[in-house]
Amino acid sequence: METEAIENIPRVCLPQIGAPAPDFKANSTFGPIKLSDYRGKWVVLFSHPGDFTPVCTTEFIAFTQVYTSFVERNVQLIGLSVDSNPSHLAWVENIYKTTGVEIPFPIIEDKDMRIAKLYGMISPAETSTSAVRAVFIIDDKQILRLILYYPLEIGRNIQEIIRIIDALQTVDKYKVLAPANWYPGMPVIVPPPKTYPELKQRLKNVEGYTCTDWYLCYKKV
Protein backbone atom coordinates (compact mmCIF):
# COMPACT_ATOMS: atom_id res chain seq x y z
CA MET A 1 0.00 0.00 0.00
CA GLU A 2 2.80 2.42 0.93
CA THR A 3 4.66 1.59 -2.30
CA GLU A 4 1.53 2.27 -4.34
CA ALA A 5 1.10 5.64 -2.63
CA ILE A 6 4.67 6.61 -3.47
CA GLU A 7 4.27 5.50 -7.08
CA ASN A 8 1.14 7.63 -7.42
CA ILE A 9 2.99 10.84 -6.54
CA PRO A 10 3.51 12.77 -9.81
CA ARG A 11 7.10 13.19 -10.92
CA VAL A 12 8.55 16.69 -11.01
CA CYS A 13 10.78 17.56 -13.96
CA LEU A 14 13.69 19.69 -12.81
CA PRO A 15 15.95 21.77 -15.03
CA GLN A 16 19.40 20.24 -15.23
CA ILE A 17 22.57 21.71 -13.76
CA GLY A 18 24.88 22.59 -16.64
CA ALA A 19 21.98 23.10 -19.07
CA PRO A 20 20.51 26.42 -20.24
CA ALA A 21 18.16 27.90 -17.65
CA PRO A 22 14.55 27.89 -18.91
CA ASP A 23 13.68 31.39 -20.11
CA PHE A 24 10.51 33.14 -18.97
CA LYS A 25 8.63 36.41 -19.06
CA ALA A 26 6.78 37.61 -15.99
CA ASN A 27 5.25 40.57 -14.22
CA SER A 28 7.01 41.67 -11.05
CA THR A 29 7.15 44.38 -8.42
CA PHE A 30 9.60 46.16 -10.75
CA GLY A 31 7.43 45.70 -13.85
CA PRO A 32 7.72 43.13 -16.66
CA ILE A 33 10.97 41.15 -16.67
CA LYS A 34 12.48 38.43 -18.85
CA LEU A 35 15.21 36.10 -17.65
CA SER A 36 17.19 36.36 -20.89
CA ASP A 37 17.39 40.15 -20.42
CA TYR A 38 19.88 39.43 -17.61
CA ARG A 39 22.37 37.65 -19.87
CA GLY A 40 25.81 38.94 -18.91
CA LYS A 41 24.88 38.96 -15.22
CA TRP A 42 24.59 36.15 -12.72
CA VAL A 43 21.08 35.53 -11.39
CA VAL A 44 19.89 34.14 -8.07
CA LEU A 45 16.28 33.10 -8.66
CA PHE A 46 14.66 32.07 -5.39
CA SER A 47 11.11 31.04 -4.57
CA HIS A 48 9.25 31.45 -1.32
CA PRO A 49 6.06 29.73 -0.11
CA GLY A 50 4.04 32.90 0.41
CA ASP A 51 3.90 36.60 1.19
CA PHE A 52 3.30 37.76 4.78
CA THR A 53 4.94 34.63 6.20
CA PRO A 54 7.51 34.92 9.01
CA VAL A 55 10.43 32.86 7.68
CA CYS A 56 10.17 34.40 4.20
CA THR A 57 10.12 37.88 5.70
CA THR A 58 13.38 37.23 7.55
CA GLU A 59 14.92 35.92 4.32
CA PHE A 60 13.99 38.97 2.28
CA ILE A 61 15.37 41.23 4.99
CA ALA A 62 18.58 39.16 5.09
CA PHE A 63 18.98 39.31 1.29
CA THR A 64 18.51 43.08 1.41
CA GLN A 65 21.04 43.57 4.21
CA VAL A 66 23.80 42.12 2.01
CA TYR A 67 22.38 43.30 -1.32
CA THR A 68 25.56 45.25 -2.16
CA SER A 69 27.54 42.00 -1.85
CA PHE A 70 25.47 40.58 -4.70
CA VAL A 71 25.81 43.76 -6.78
CA GLU A 72 29.61 43.65 -6.35
CA ARG A 73 29.57 40.12 -7.75
CA ASN A 74 27.46 41.09 -10.77
CA VAL A 75 24.47 39.17 -9.41
CA GLN A 76 20.78 40.00 -9.90
CA LEU A 77 18.39 38.77 -7.20
CA ILE A 78 14.89 37.73 -8.31
CA GLY A 79 12.25 36.50 -5.88
CA LEU A 80 9.16 34.48 -6.84
CA SER A 81 5.98 33.10 -5.34
CA VAL A 82 2.55 32.13 -6.63
CA ASP A 83 1.02 35.18 -4.94
CA SER A 84 -0.32 38.13 -6.96
CA ASN A 85 1.63 41.28 -7.66
CA PRO A 86 -0.70 43.37 -5.42
CA SER A 87 0.07 40.93 -2.60
CA HIS A 88 3.81 41.27 -3.25
CA LEU A 89 3.55 45.06 -3.23
CA ALA A 90 1.54 45.10 0.00
CA TRP A 91 4.03 42.76 1.66
CA VAL A 92 7.06 44.78 0.52
CA GLU A 93 5.42 47.96 1.81
CA ASN A 94 4.60 46.26 5.11
CA ILE A 95 8.23 45.15 5.51
CA TYR A 96 9.34 48.73 4.91
CA LYS A 97 6.82 50.19 7.37
CA THR A 98 7.55 47.72 10.15
CA THR A 99 11.33 47.29 9.78
CA GLY A 100 12.56 50.18 7.64
CA VAL A 101 14.00 47.70 5.11
CA GLU A 102 13.23 48.52 1.47
CA ILE A 103 13.42 45.47 -0.82
CA PRO A 104 15.66 46.48 -3.77
CA PHE A 105 15.02 43.56 -6.14
CA PRO A 106 11.98 42.31 -8.10
CA ILE A 107 9.52 39.70 -6.89
CA ILE A 108 7.80 37.75 -9.67
CA GLU A 109 4.04 37.22 -9.79
CA ASP A 110 3.40 33.59 -10.75
CA LYS A 111 -0.30 33.06 -10.05
CA ASP A 112 -0.67 30.41 -12.76
CA MET A 113 2.40 28.59 -11.39
CA ARG A 114 3.88 28.50 -14.89
CA ILE A 115 7.41 29.41 -13.82
CA ALA A 116 7.19 27.42 -10.58
CA LYS A 117 6.31 24.31 -12.58
CA LEU A 118 8.95 25.08 -15.22
CA TYR A 119 11.60 25.06 -12.48
CA GLY A 120 10.12 22.25 -10.39
CA MET A 121 9.25 24.54 -7.49
CA ILE A 122 5.89 22.91 -6.73
CA SER A 123 6.27 19.75 -4.68
CA PRO A 124 3.68 17.07 -5.53
CA ALA A 125 4.15 15.61 -2.05
CA GLU A 126 2.86 18.81 -0.43
CA THR A 127 -0.85 19.48 -0.01
CA SER A 128 -0.30 23.19 -0.66
CA THR A 129 0.32 24.71 -4.10
CA SER A 130 2.83 27.12 -2.57
CA ALA A 131 6.26 27.16 -4.16
CA VAL A 132 8.91 25.34 -2.17
CA ARG A 133 11.86 27.26 -0.71
CA ALA A 134 14.28 26.86 -3.63
CA VAL A 135 17.37 28.64 -4.97
CA PHE A 136 18.60 28.54 -8.57
CA ILE A 137 21.96 30.09 -9.43
CA ILE A 138 22.28 30.98 -13.11
CA ASP A 139 25.55 32.22 -14.57
CA ASP A 140 26.21 35.10 -16.94
CA LYS A 141 25.78 32.79 -19.94
CA GLN A 142 22.31 31.73 -18.68
CA ILE A 143 23.52 28.26 -17.65
CA LEU A 144 21.99 26.77 -14.52
CA ARG A 145 24.85 26.13 -12.11
CA LEU A 146 23.24 25.17 -8.81
CA ILE A 147 19.91 24.13 -7.28
CA LEU A 148 19.16 24.25 -3.54
CA TYR A 149 15.97 23.14 -1.78
CA TYR A 150 15.07 23.97 1.80
CA PRO A 151 12.23 22.68 3.97
CA LEU A 152 9.44 25.18 4.54
CA GLU A 153 10.33 25.48 8.22
CA ILE A 154 13.96 26.58 7.72
CA GLY A 155 15.25 29.85 6.28
CA ARG A 156 18.10 30.07 3.80
CA ASN A 157 21.69 30.84 4.78
CA ILE A 158 22.40 33.93 2.65
CA GLN A 159 26.13 33.87 3.40
CA GLU A 160 26.31 30.33 2.04
CA ILE A 161 24.68 31.50 -1.20
CA ILE A 162 27.33 34.23 -1.49
CA ARG A 163 30.06 31.66 -0.77
CA ILE A 164 28.73 29.43 -3.54
CA ILE A 165 28.74 32.32 -6.01
CA ASP A 166 32.33 33.15 -5.03
CA ALA A 167 33.30 29.52 -5.57
CA LEU A 168 31.56 29.26 -8.95
CA GLN A 169 33.08 32.49 -10.22
CA THR A 170 36.53 31.44 -8.98
CA VAL A 171 36.49 28.00 -10.61
CA ASP A 172 35.27 29.57 -13.85
CA LYS A 173 37.99 32.22 -13.87
CA TYR A 174 40.96 30.04 -12.90
CA LYS A 175 39.78 26.62 -14.17
CA VAL A 176 40.26 25.05 -10.75
CA LEU A 177 38.18 23.17 -8.17
CA ALA A 178 36.92 24.40 -4.80
CA PRO A 179 37.52 22.07 -1.83
CA ALA A 180 35.18 21.52 1.11
CA ASN A 181 34.48 24.60 3.23
CA TRP A 182 36.30 26.84 0.74
CA TYR A 183 36.19 30.61 1.12
CA PRO A 184 37.91 33.32 -0.98
CA GLY A 185 41.61 33.55 -0.13
CA MET A 186 41.95 29.85 0.64
CA PRO A 187 43.89 27.47 -1.66
CA VAL A 188 42.01 25.84 -4.50
CA ILE A 189 42.45 22.37 -6.00
CA VAL A 190 44.32 21.92 -9.27
CA PRO A 191 42.29 19.64 -11.58
CA PRO A 192 43.80 16.13 -11.44
CA PRO A 193 45.53 14.57 -14.46
CA LYS A 194 43.20 12.81 -16.90
CA THR A 195 45.80 10.57 -18.56
CA TYR A 196 48.86 8.61 -17.47
CA PRO A 197 51.27 10.93 -19.33
CA GLU A 198 49.67 13.88 -17.53
CA LEU A 199 50.05 12.02 -14.22
CA LYS A 200 53.77 11.51 -14.85
CA GLN A 201 54.17 15.16 -15.78
CA ARG A 202 52.39 16.21 -12.60
CA LEU A 203 54.80 14.14 -10.50
CA LYS A 204 57.75 15.83 -12.20
CA ASN A 205 56.39 19.36 -11.93
CA VAL A 206 54.75 20.31 -8.64
CA GLU A 207 56.32 23.76 -8.35
CA GLY A 208 53.80 26.18 -6.92
CA TYR A 209 51.58 23.35 -5.73
CA THR A 210 51.07 21.76 -2.32
CA CYS A 211 50.31 18.12 -3.02
CA THR A 212 48.96 15.32 -0.84
CA ASP A 213 49.36 13.00 -3.81
CA TRP A 214 49.28 13.25 -7.60
CA TYR A 215 45.48 13.59 -7.69
CA LEU A 216 45.17 16.16 -4.87
CA CYS A 217 47.22 19.32 -5.31
CA TYR A 218 46.45 22.79 -4.03
CA LYS A 219 47.54 26.23 -5.16
CA LYS A 220 46.81 29.87 -4.37
CA VAL A 221 44.94 32.06 -6.84
UniProtKB/Swiss-Prot annotation:
PROSITE patterns to which the protein is assigned, alphabetical: THIOREDOXIN_2
Enzyme class, first EC level, given as a word: oxidoreductase
Catalytic reaction annotation: a hydroperoxide + [thioredoxin]-dithiol = an alcohol + [thioredoxin]-disulfide + H2O
GO molecular function, one term: thioredoxin peroxidase activity
Pfam family, any one: 1-cysPrx_C
Binding site for substrate: 133
SUPFAM superfamilies associated with the record: Thioredoxin-like
GO cellular component entries: cytosol
Record domain Thioredoxin: where: 15-170
Record-annotated disulphide pairs: 211-217
E.C. designation(s): 1.11.1.24
GO biological process: cell redox homeostasis; cellular response to stress; hydrogen peroxide catabolic process; response to oxidative stress
Positions of the catalytic residues: 56 (cysteine sulfenic acid (-soh) intermediate)
Compartments where located: Cytoplasm
UniProt KW keywords: Antioxidant, Cytoplasm, Disulfide bond, Oxidoreductase, Peroxidase, Redox-active center
Family: Belongs to the peroxiredoxin family. Prx6 subfamily.
Annotated function: Thiol-specific peroxidase that catalyzes the reduction of hydrogen peroxide and organic hydroperoxides to water and alcohols, respectively. Plays a role in cell protection against oxidative stress by detoxifying peroxides.
Subunit structure: Homodecamer. Pentamer of dimers that assemble into a ring structure.
Other noteworthy facts: The active site is a conserved redox-active cysteine residue, the peroxidatic cysteine (C(P)), which makes the nucleophilic attack on the peroxide substrate. The peroxide oxidizes the C(P)-SH to cysteine sulfenic acid (C(P)-SOH), which then reacts with another cysteine residue, the resolving cysteine (C(R)), to form a disulfide bridge. The disulfide is subsequently reduced by an appropriate electron donor to complete the catalytic cycle.
Protein name: Peroxiredoxin 2
Native source species: Caldanaerobacter subterraneus subsp. tengcongensis (strain DSM 15242 / JCM 11007 / NBRC 100824 / MB4)
